[in-house]
Amino acid sequence: MSIVNLSSYHFATIEDTAAWRPFVTERCNALGLKGTILLAPEGINLFVAGTRENTDAFIHYIRHDALFEGKFVDLQFKESLSDKQPFTRMLVKLKREIITMKKPAIRPELGRAPFVDAPTLKHWLDRGHDDQGRPVVMLDTRNAFEVDVGTFDNALDYRITKFSEFPEVIEQNRADLEGKTVVSFCTGGIRCEKAAIHMKEVGIENVYQLEGGILKYFEEVGGAHYHGDCFVFDYRTALNPQLEPSKTTQCFGCRAVVPPQAQESPLYVAGKTCPECHPDSKAARAA
């Protein structure tokens, strides 16, 4: 039996997340779903998995239940299939932000960030400029270890280790973006949307987010102008441009990402060590 994996997020003002939590938890448990749902004053961020029947019922619930006051009626979901349940339990958490930037919360009532869809972005990258003739720069908003698994060709990568570092690195590197069309991107859209909103707020012009992130881009146009895979935060580790699990894995010992070529190293022992944490590599670095 295939398991349906759903992910989605939406920026919307939520007045009382604590009041929502028990109702959402009860419904998810009744449907036998597992995963995590984050509720914050700025919106919702969710990753859940279950049978086709129950995930369809969950989608209808989120879009139409009176609890949500119509805030999520147009909520779009990214979907993939797996042969087993990727999550071990169902959690509904209350957060200050649905993705942590440590900046004042997004004000959803002011509207979402400008976006570019995958076919349009591919057209821009094919030509080397946008429809107004401005050069296009791709800005990766993910953590460095994710970028190392795969990214867009010639993308800006500021080697951040957590998303809350993003505002500072943008302030330090504004010159890289001047006079260009900036397209921020991430795995599924949430980080690049918040990044685009922040850049607009600090006066950077011609900023877009990639609608739906890398995974939606893969779904609609494949791997054009992209090299490598896309890291995902579940047991699959990484997906290729065909949205299939790749051979990239994570080290059992240190959780470092281990691409196929690194798995050929004698320092990689499945279920134990990798070139990052093997005692021999640590000793060599210390010498």
UniProtKB/Swiss-Prot annotation:
Highest taxon of the lineage: Bacteria
EC number(s) recorded for this UniProt protein: 1.14.-.-
Residues forming the Rhodanese domain are 132-226
According to its UniProt record, which protein family does this protein belong to?
Belongs to the TrhO family.
Gene label: trhO
Cross-referenced Gene3D superfamilies: 3.30.70.100, Rhodanese-like domain
Q: Which of UniProt's keywords are assigned here?
A: Oxidoreductase, tRNA processing
**By what name is this protein known?**
tRNA uridine(34) hydroxylase
Taxonomy, top ranks, is: Bacteria, Pseudomonadati, Pseudomonadota, Betaproteobacteria, Burkholderiales
What residue range is the signal peptide? none
Where in the sequence is the active site?
Answer: 186 (cysteine persulfide intermediate)
